[in-house]
Amino acid sequence: MAVFTHITKEDLKDFLKNYSFNNLDFIKGINEGIQNTNYKVGIDSNDYILTIYENITDTNDINFFLELMIHLSSNNIKCPTPVKNLENKSIGRIKSKSSALLTFLEGKSISSIEESHTYEIGKALAEMHLNVTNFKLEKKNDLSYNGWSDLIELNQKKLNFLEENLYNKLKKELNRIRDLWPKDLPSGIIHADLFPDNVLFLNNKVSGLIDFYFSCNDFFAYDLSICINAWCFNKENKFSKEIFRSLLKGYQELKPLTDSELENLPVLCSGSALRFLLTRVDNWNSSNEVDIVNYQDPKEFLSRLKFHEQINNIEDYGL
């Protein structure tokens, strides 16, 4: 989340005329993140999040994300709920951009990850996967392995600046991943971006999953592999077998992994590490950021990709 589009109280009051509210109490920009403009707003003594969509221009995509949140909320998954306006729509417009008002969730992201946290993350991810089976909308994964080759070609100079001959190394690694990529695993809607900054904790329990704007259809185990890359490496980029085991324990208590999912987890982890390496390189020095925006270092995912290259089976992770 970030602030790209500046709005005033008067702008927001005009936006809120299409809602059944009375008083606008405050408006405060949120600087974290890189995708959308976000404000915390107080209305009628309650807190909300106003999201202004910067990079997502297709209203069908926005509607998919918002309907997914409505579906998950109705199935007791802790996530923001879009507020419908007087026209019974979740999408409005402010400063000529698609926007949505979402309920505010209490809690904070954690910076020091412990086994108890990843156990809760595993359970939360499994709960989400179990509750999307009857969600009727679909969205293909625009950042699946079919698109990684284009990102490698597009960012050749950046990759070789990051590390000598990295462009050719990643082309070779992508071929390895493609050869091993599974054809048929349990699948459905995944979060696809469940990093620590997208999970809120309150009293050491998950109080909310946020930022569903990469959600799409893909393998459930691929979603789990993203969590492994996001949660199971410490600040020195060292893999923690204990954190890994607690993540899988929480997940499998609610949704046991199939033998095929376990067998393919190493290549899925390689794939998700490559995906985030490439998108971080693509975002690296390539945006005209307006305010304070947290661009992320691609090097940490290069290190994680190299780690997964050495993994031969699930036991090598310490399971």
Regions found by a protein language model. Give the residues of each.
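ATP/Mg2+ or Mg2+-diphosphate-binding catalytic cores
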Residues: 276-319
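Conserved NTP-binding catalytic cores of kinases and kinase-like/nucleotidyltransferase enzymes
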Residues: 1-84, 205, 316-319
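All-alpha amphipathic helical-bundle segments outside canonical DNA-binding/catalytic cores
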Residues: 257-269
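A cross-family kinase active-site recognition segment
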Residues: 112-165, 187
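Active-site acidic catalytic loop and adjacent metal/ATP-binding pocket
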Residues: 34-42, 49-50, 82, 175-222
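Active-site activation/catalytic loop segments of kinase-like enzymes and analogous catalytic loops
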Residues: 221-255, 270-287
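A glycine-centered beta->alpha junction motif in the catalytic cores
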Residues: 99-112, 153-156, 276-291
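ATP-binding pocket architecture of kinase catalytic cores
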Residues: 43-137
